[in-house]
């Protein structure tokens, strides 16, 4: 319904600092088009694409690509979704956007703004394998009802490693967590050797946040914060 997952679009006030942070974690650069007039760069671990925009917008945004988005937006609206914005026209880069029940922004644009990476999906970063983009929401059921018609399959709630509900799809997996776990979206990474990875990151002077969700073992879990404020949760396993 939404098209092909493109990137997690993130606002940054200092794109150079953000790029340097993801480089230190082992992410690679992607080539970009000249669509955006503002400074823009894309970092990837082979699975996840992080679009860094030195521009003010609702951030982070889950961004998809679907050709003919001006017309396709009507198909999205048939699911009862009200568009929060529409920028369409012959002289515009067409895009539409809406919010899920938690307020998470989602954008669908007419064409890619970066190229595919040559990096293999198996070439994980120092953070481990990207697992899911997790969204804070007080109630899980409205999120399930919203996202399932858009191509996601919601799994049952689980309390390991914290209370969450996973929603899988062909392109990117989402999840929902309680705001008391962390009151912002998280990029979640998992690896069975996460303890060793965390020690490696510490040796590279990557700072660990003290806001690690309650119940997680700091020997095998860590919370990183990018310069622009993005939360990256590192854990041994998501299930």
Model-derived features: where do they sit?
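N-terminal beta-strand motif that seeds the catalytic metal site of vicinal oxygen chelate
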Residues: 1-16, 60-62, 109-145, 150, ...
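Core segments of cupin and vicinal oxygen chelate
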Residues: 2-3, 9-49, 134-172
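Vicinal oxygen chelate
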Residues: 4-13, 42, 54-129, 135, 157-158, 164-168, ...
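A short linear hydrophobic-aromatic micro-motif
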Residues: 29-31, 50-51, 82-86, 174-175, ...
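Short loop/beta submotifs within extracellular cysteine-rich repeat domains
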Residues: 30, 50-52, 72, 154-156, ...
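A short beta-turn/loop motif at secondary-structure boundaries
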Residues: 34-35, 56, 88-91, 179-181, ...
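Short, flexible, solvent-exposed loop/turn segments with mixed acidic/basic and small polar residues
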Residues: 51-54, 120-124, 175-179
